[in-house]
Regions:
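Sec/Tat signal peptide C-region and signal peptidase I cleavage site
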Residues: 16-21
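Early extracytoplasmic/lumenal segment of secretory-pathway proteins
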Residues: 22-86
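Short beta-strand->loop
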Residues: 27-30, 126-128, 148-172, 185-188, ...
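A structural signal for short loop-to-beta-strand junctions that line the ligand-binding cleft
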Residues: 71-76, 94-124, 128, 140, ...
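Ligand-binding pocket segment of bilobal, Venus flytrap-like solute-binding proteins
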Residues: 167, 172-242
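A bilobed periplasmic-binding-protein/Venus flytrap-type ligand-binding module shared by bacterial periplasmic
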Residues: 123-130, 166, 243, 251-264, ...
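Extracellular/periplasmic bilobal clamshell ligand-binding domains
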Residues: 301-338
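Mature extracytoplasmic/periplasmic domains
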Residues: 254-315
Length: 338
């Protein structure tokens, strides 16, 4: 009798373990409600429950590191390859192999440890009623003396700027990038302040001729989700895609990686693969105004109206953003970039 009870106990323990394992735990620094809707679609298709812990990057990373082997986190998702790369440098991701992910994602938008889910471009904004930028305008040009007092951009502690500078280091070297940063600082129309939308608003208000900001922000403003004033301001502004005569416009990603101690690795891989399907990509671009990672998907019309044929920088591996992040911040700080 005792033997039977023991076997039954093992049976239910195994059943319970299987039930618990049919889930995936995401730690996400992305702030979109639409992501949760996407995870619900994944659950409906696979039966795998998705548990989400949302927060800011620093807090999430601190928790994952402190919990160590006891962490229940399977998948870490965030915006910006620089953040993913920096976390990778701390040894918090594990190598992941997936034929589906490798086939779907261009090699420069992934690493052996993490994968791009969607793309964004960091571009130059201008008011066409006041400014006519040259057709060959580049990021490098913004440091030239003729642009003195004409440029607005966020602070140096912004990771999007750090990744932009990291890409310049990758392409031009530290010495040239340091000189560029000094020139850019001297050309700033004001001390850096505010978010990306604040830079676009400054150009709309005539405070500067050029603003550096990510592409999805103009679409967000045009959508009316940030109010009628920002919508009206955005209608005055256009994005310019720099470096079309060279390597192409600076691209970055939203992405995710499977964590070192992930208890549900197989489910985490399934979720990543789902995020790169046609259904998921269409959902992402139509809700976040990002560019799709896979071919054959059209971005939201609010971003597509500005053109889809621009040359993207497909040469620079986004994994270099994390590797060059410390050097980028040092260069920015030494240049007096607040």
């Amino acid at each position: 009798m005792k033997k039977i009870i023991f076997l039954i106990s093992i049976f239910f323990t195994l059943i319970g373990s299987t039930s618990i394992a049919n889930e995936v735990n995401i730690f996400s620094a992305r702030h979109y409600d639409s992501d949760v809707q996407l995870y619900e679609k994944f659950t409906a298709k696979t039966g795998i429950k998705v548990n989400v812990v949302s927060g800011k990057d620093k807090a999430l990373q601190k928790r994952i590191i402190e919990e160590g082997k006891d962490s229940k986190a399977d998948l870490y998702i965030t915006a910006d390859a620089g953040r993913l790369g920096a976390f990778q440098e701390k040894g918090m991701f594990q190598k992941t192999s997936s034929k589906a992910l490798k086939a779907a994602i261009p090699s420069n938008f992934r690493s052996p440890y993490w994968f791009g889910i969607a793309k964004r471009a960091r571009v130059i904004y201008y008011n066409p009623s006041r400014t006519n930028p040259p057709s060959n305008l580049s990021y490098e040009d913004l440091a030239e003396p003729k642009y003195k007092g004409k440029v607005v951009i966020r602070k140096s502690n912004n990771v999007y700027n750090q990744s932009l500078v990291a890409s310049l280091i990758a392409n031009n070297g530290k010495k040239k990038t340091a000189k560029w940063a000094e020139g850019l600082v001297s050309n700033m129309a004001r001390k850096p302040k505010g978010n990306d939308r604040a830079q676009i608003l400054a150009v709309a208000a005539g405070e500067a001729e050029y603003a550096v900001a990510n592409t999805y922000y103009i679409a967000l403003m045009l959508s009316g989700k940030k109010g009628p004033e920002q919508q009206a301001a955005a209608k005055k502004i256009k994005p310019f895609f720099p470096n079309q005569d060279g390597r192409g416009t600076h691209m970055n990603i939203s992405g995710g990686g499977i964590l070192k101690y992930a208890p549900n690795k197989a489910n985490a891989i399934k979720l990543l693969e789902f995020l790169l399907t046609k259904e998921a990509q269409e959902h992402i671009v139509n809700n976040t105004f990002e560019y799709p990672m896979i071919e054959g998907i059209k971005p939201n019309k609010l971003i597509a109206q500005f053109g889809l044929g621009f040359k993207q920088d497909l040469k620079t591996k986004v994994s270099k953003y994390g590797k060059n992040q410390a050097s980028a911040l040092k260069i920015m700080t030494e240049a007096g970039w607040e």
